[in-house]
Design a protein with these regions (language model features):
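N-terminal accessory segment detector
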Residues: 1-67
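Arginine residue identity/basic-tract feature
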Residues: 12, 46, 89, 94-97, ...
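Beta-rich nucleic-acid/ligand-interaction surfaces
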Residues: 103-113
Length: 113
């Protein structure tokens, strides 16, 4: 089994408990992002918007497309901000284009530079 469905209340409780988390935890989240990039690349995903739409199915966020190169992720749980941001920093670290990721209150902005 590759995925688990987690109730939003559990998701919030998990991140409330984790708090800042250890460096090891965040390094692992980053590396999981890198690994997912390889997996999605092998599946043929190249377009940033399509990738964000695909990951949106996890219910981590609701995607707003601001422009062709700018996206806002409205988080389901604000406590998951660092988790989602760190995952995508790892994920897009393999991208040939520069991607800026900015955390804001209950949302994350992603911009292709």
């Amino acid at each position: 089994m590759e995925h688990v469905i987690v109730d939003i209340a559990h998701w919030k409780a998990i991140f409330s408990e984790i708090g800042e988390g250890s460096n090891k935890f965040w390094e692992e989240v980053y590396q999981i992002g890198v690994d997912h990039w390889k997996e999605y690349y092998d599946k043929g995903f190249r377009n940033i918007q399509k990738i964000l739409e695909y990951v949106e199915k996890t219910n981590w966020y609701k995607l707003n497309v601001d422009s062709e190169n700018t996206f806002t992720l409205i988080l389901s749980v604000s406590e998951a901000s660092k988790f989602v941001s760190t995952f995508f920093k790892g994920f897009f670290s393999r991208q040939s284009r520069k991607i800026e990721i900015t955390e804001e209150f209950k949302k994350i902005r992603i911009r292709v530079v």
